[in-house]
Amino acid sequence: MDLQLKQWRSQQQNESEEQGSAATKISNFFFDQIQSQTATSAAAAPLPLFVPEPTSSSSFSCFSPDSSNSSSSSRFLKMGNFFSWAQWQELELQALIYRYMLAGASVPQELLLPIKKSLLHQSPMHFLHHPLQHSFPHHQPSWYWGRGAMDPEPGRCKRTDGKKWRCSRDVVAGHKYCDRHIHRGRNRSRKPVETATTTITTTATTTASSFVLGEELGHGPNNNHFFSSGSSQPLHLSHQQSCSSEMKQESNNNKRPYEANSGFSNGRSDDGHILRHFFDDWPRSSDSTSSPMSSSTCHLSISMPGNNTSSDVSLKLSTGNEEEEENMRNNNNEREQMNWWSNGGNHHNNMGGPLAEALRSASSTSSVLHQMGISTQVFH
């Protein structure tokens, strides 16, 4: 037992001496590097701070050339109980790099080279080589700490189908995809469909409205002042949108001049319908509601003075169409616009047509002049 203990002690002493000599060699290497850096630098930067002094109590005093092998070995023996030689070497190197960082100086490449070599010798699970390391050395980074492989073509669009295909376009600046795939995964909305709805409305002034009404009732020379004293309000003519309504309106416009100039002497229209509702008394109270003018009938309001009294007679010219007559009963604004004798009754022109025939028939008991007791000489 004593022999084995003596052999074990001698072996431990030999190992400690060998480790002490190796530590001395490493310390001399670092000291030479620091001395070269301080000698080549023009200004006395913080590098002299790392030069160990004999009186310094730092942990690097054991690496100074003035220190003996016994002191370095004794210091390492004190710390060797906690760290192995490789761990101690790495700890001293990291402490030196940390001092460079505290001083704000650039860390020399020689101090980083051992770390890089140690990382390269480790397992590939902890470090992955850059793909451009061999083909493009100028693109080779110092090291890569990522978990996945680097992109072999960083300027190429990353749009893939999950297999082998990949987009061949260049990426947009500041993005991962090209201009075609930059909106990948973004919701797209349809453009709103614009439907243009046009409504055609025509407005006529008083002159235009009186001209249209003059065309409907007659074109003779005696009808020049028939609607001369109409109201100054414009008439709003609604445009027919359907084709059937337009055709109906055109047919009515084509036959109105003939109906106005025919005189209605036989009491029948061109279609063979018997004219009825020739006289229609409207109430004196007029509504203020406006409605579009019909094309077949007209409402006339006449005020005739006589026997110090005035009476209003409303006349309606009918063509025998029941629908048009029903529609004309709703046109209350027309009798206000067509009141040409409301200002005094000074227009006594010779009128033709069914209106003149009704006024001239003195023998008829249902005549307006017979009921009012007015002589027919006033209108001749």
From Swiss-Prot:
UniProt entry keywords in alphabetical sequence: Activator, Nucleus, Transcription, Transcription regulation
GO BP annotations listed: DNA-templated transcription; leaf development; regulation of DNA-templated transcription
Major localisation: nucleus
Keyword Nucleus assigned: yes
Segments for region (Disordered): 1-21, 222-270, 284-330
Residue ranges of domain WRC in the record: 151-195
Compositional bias segments (type: Low complexity): 228-245, 285-296
A Pfam family this chain is assigned to: WRC
The keyword ATP-binding belongs to this UniProt entry's keyword annotation: no
Gene Ontology cellular component terms for the protein in this record: nucleus
Cell location: Nucleus
Induction behaviour: microRNA 396 (miR396a or miR396b) negatively regulates growth-regulating factors (GRF1-4 and GRF7-9).
Tissues where this protein is expressed: Strongly expressed in actively growing and developing tissues, such as roots, upper stems, and shoot tips containing the shoot apical meristem (SAM) and flower buds. Also expressed in mature flowers, but weakly expressed in mature stems and leaves.
Signal peptide: none
Molecular functions (GO terms): ATP binding
Short sequence motif named Bipartite nuclear localization signal, residue ranges: 156-166, 184-191
Domain of life: Eukaryota
Biased composition (Polar residues): 297-320
Domain QLQ: 82-117
Free-text comment about domains: The QLQ domain and WRC domain may be involved in protein-protein interaction and DNA-binding, respectively.
Function (record text): Transcription activator that plays a role in the regulation of cell expansion in leaf and cotyledons tissues. Component of a network formed by miR396, the GRFs and their interacting factors (GIFs) acting in the regulation of meristem function, at least partially through the control of cell proliferation.
Assigned protein family: Belongs to the GRF family.
This protein's name: Growth-regulating factor 4
Species the sequence originates in: Arabidopsis thaliana
Lineage: Eukaryota, Viridiplantae, Streptophyta, Embryophyta, Tracheophyta
